[in-house]
Every structure is written in structure tokens, then in C-alpha cells.
Amino acid sequence: MTGGGLMQLVAYGAQDVYLTGNPQITFFKVVYRRHTNFAMESIENPFNGAPNFGKKVTCTIQRNGDLIHRMYLQATLPQVALQSTDGSGAQFRWLNWIGHNLINYVEIEIGGQRIDKHYGDWMHIWNELTQEAGKQAGYAKMVGNVPELTNLLYQGGSNCDNDCYGGEPLTSEVITSCAPMYTLYIPLQFWFCRNPGLALPLIALQYHEVRINLEFDSLNNLCWDYSNGSSDAHAIRNRVGQCGLAAASLYVDYIYLDTDERRKFAQVSHEYLIDVLQFTGGESITSSANKLKLNFNHPCKELVWVVQRDSYVSCDDSIINPWKGQQPFNYSDWWDRSVLESGYSVTRVEGMAGKNPVVTALLQLNGHDRFQVRDGNYFNLVQPYQHHTNIPAVGINVYSFALQPEQHQPSGTCNLSRIDNTTLLLTVSNNAVGTNLSSTVRVYATNYNVLRIMSGINFVLNACAAFMYGFALANHLCSRASCPANKQGQTV
């Protein structure tokens, strides 16, 4: 008996010409493309000096392969155990999202010139906007947002799990007196880390070293403790500080090319369209109405801003002790009580009590309104819904000039180099700037630039750098015919 599907096949009319007339593809014959031969390997690169809390370190990227792609900071936190001398009421916990919080800043430098600089705060915001739902729980484990680190330690609690002994592992509900040694894997988010087509060609940078400079945050911004066993209320933290980081290094994914492609990469010039971060520092505010001048340049994909109460990152024990530590990634206008109610190990913070401190926002370009005044939730909810993978936590605000700002392919920009005055007008809630309250506004911009890598063959390095950095293709910073001595290109 003939199947009913044939009825669909013969029901063909003039309207179908727009869909199936002169077909260009078939769904029933797979087509693939052959690729060049290559191999990948992740290799550990050590830091120069001893990495530790509050220290600045540098990693000179080893020339183990032809290109570099992904990078991960691997850092091991020391084991923390309460001692009887800490007192009966002693407590300790690592702060949430310790992996992001650990990084004060990280920057990439090529030939002595800084190309891009990221911050732990930005890495957390970027994760909130872009992380796929299926990876969020695993990513939280990678960066240490787990109960065994963020739950409070109490005197008389259970000891840490020991892998050398059998038995059922401790659950998050079990009270412990010990936080285990824990290795963090924090992925860096530079342009070449996110797209293999932008992998940085070490083989073409024959005369320039690539360095990663990183500053770890100080320990008092990473944990909370209380000790009533001595005159030192921070005896536990000081003991952890003496131990320091157990280990820290950089894991780099190297790409090895086959002979022909390797020769081509080494001999020809390269020009990469890259996206980098701009941040000019936080601005303190104490009033509800604020007018912020944005000193950004280059074609900008989007603006991202947060307003954070200064009390959330205070070092005053009388302020943070009721909340068991600082809340560096709380961008709402009230303390996050959900961390208390959930045992400190929430992987996201939608349940917080506070609201978006941005009541309204307006962007002006040379005195002209870019849009009408909008409610803060438009930037916290609608804009991320339109342009990003995730709708972020409360208080992360976005305005995108691009259709798809997460993608490398340009899909819209605003050239802020051609705008004399870019101004962000914010109305902020009284919970953020009320009586005796102050907050800090941080505005980030992602923009395009061009990285030029010139072949070292027949090249006078003293007269012209082997790589050039600047956006305008028409305004060449370097040419073989004319090259000002020692000109190193534009600074970000």
C-alpha cells in the first residue's frame, strides 16, 4: 500500500517555487570539507617568580608550538583546617566565585606592548552573559564556586575527605572544620582563546616574546574568617596567608601545523581583526542622578556597566561580618541574603533580595540621545535576551550596537573614535546611594581593532616593529617604504 507521504510530494504548486524551485542543497547527502593537517597539545607554562596572594607574576609563553589557542590559569588553594587555638566560635569560608575573585587583572603583552587587559570582575560578567546553560554547573566547579569551599567551617565539624581512604564522600549538608586543597581552572578570555581562527601565530612572531602578566588579589578580598581564641581576630586568614597558594601556572593549548602551512605562516604577513576590552576605571557616585563621560575609542560592539555599593567590598569587619564576607559579585542594591539561605554555594544569584540599582539609563552621543530614557530592567533583561546567550544576574546592564556581540563576525558597531562626547546618564536607587552610602560605577566596552604581524624576513627591526597594532587600515602605522624609527604602533 502506498504511503500517505506521496500525497505531500505531489501537492506541489506555484508557491513552492520560492522554497524548492531550482534547489541548491539536499538534506540527504552530507557534504564535508577537508582540512589541513594539525595537532593540539596543552602544555604547562610556569610563572616567573613565586605566585601568591597579592603578587604580580609574569609568564613568558614558551615556543613549544606554532600557534597558541586556549589558556587556563591553574591555581591550587591550600587546605584550611580550624585549630583549637582559634577558639570555640572560629569560622572560615572562601568567598563565592573564588576563581574570578582571585584575578585582579590579567593582560597579554607582545613585544613589550600591552594588547588587551581583563579583570576578574569582567570575567565574571562575561560568564554571566555568555556561558551556555549546560556548562554552568561544571564551570562553577572549575572556578571554585562549590560547597566545600564556600560553606562555613565550624569547630567540631567533620574533617576533609581523604582520597586515600574509602567511604562515602561528605555531602554539602555536612558541617566541616576543614576546607580541602582545591585546584581551580580559570579559562582566560582573550580574542585568540575564543576562536581557533584567531589563534596567535608564534611562528610569525620570531622577534617578539608573548607575555601574560597577572596580578592576584590580596587574601583579605578572597576569604572571610573569625577567630575568638586570641587577640588576633584574623588568625585563620593570617595562617592561610603564610601557607600561600599551593601552586599556580598557566596551561596553554599549542597548535602544531603541517610543513606547508607552517612555512606559509612563518613567511607571510598576517592581519587579524580582534576584539579587545576597554575599561577606564570605576567612578564613585553619591547621588541619585549621575552623568558619566565615557572615554572610549574605536568601533565599539557593546557597553556593559554595573553599579556596586562600596560596602559590598569593604574591609570593615563590622560591615561584612553579618554577611560572612564581602560580596564582590553582587551588583544589586541590597545585600545578597540568598548565600546565607543556600549554604553559600549558589551557582547563580537570581534569588537575591536586591534590585537593579540602575533605575533609568540614557546614552548620549555628542549631546544627542541615542535612545529614549529606558527603565533599568531593559538593559538588565531585554538587551541580554536579544543579544547574548544568557540573561545575567541582577544589576549587569548591557547596551549592544551589534546584533551578535559574542561572535567574531562584525554585526554592528558604533565608532566612538568619531564621537567627541559619549555620555551615560544614570538614575540610581536610594539603596545604592542613600544616606551614608556610596557606590562605584564600572563601564566596560568591547571594541574591534586590527593586529598586524609582519614577516621577519628582510625586515629591519630597529626601524619598524614586527607587529603593528591599530584600527584604521588606511592609516598604515608601518610600511616597508616608510617607517619612522622605533614606532611601536598605537596603544589601546
Predicted regions and their residues:
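Short, low-complexity Pro/Thr/Gly
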Residues: 1-492
